[in-house]
Amino acid sequence: MRHVVPAARLALGALFAATGVGGFLGLLPLAAPHAFQVMLIESGWMKVVKAIELGAGLLLLSNRFVPLGLALLAPGVVSITLYHLLLDPAFLWIVPVIVALEGFLLWTYRGSFRGLLVRDAQPGA
């Protein structure tokens, strides 16, 4: 386990940092983009998504605030999964990789999320 966690963290961080940078620089291939993807790009929302991917990827790569990076990536991982399952199965092969890395790291860092699961949380506590 000594090398597995850093390897998973670096792999997921590199993947999302690269797609974040690629999205900003227009380096990602778009083969016949789906209408949903076009809407995200035209509305400017894709820039927000890519900024979050880049920021969270850099957090994972730097080994700083890793639980925050994982929390920021979680909604994106769900979106990527649903997008490829329902709309664009061409890149479906990447989904198990992303889900496995994110799930493994969330489980590994689960202690950092315990405070979020307090049933009757009090303000300021």
Regions found by a protein language model. Give the residues of each.
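Membrane-interface extramembranous regions
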Residues: 1-125
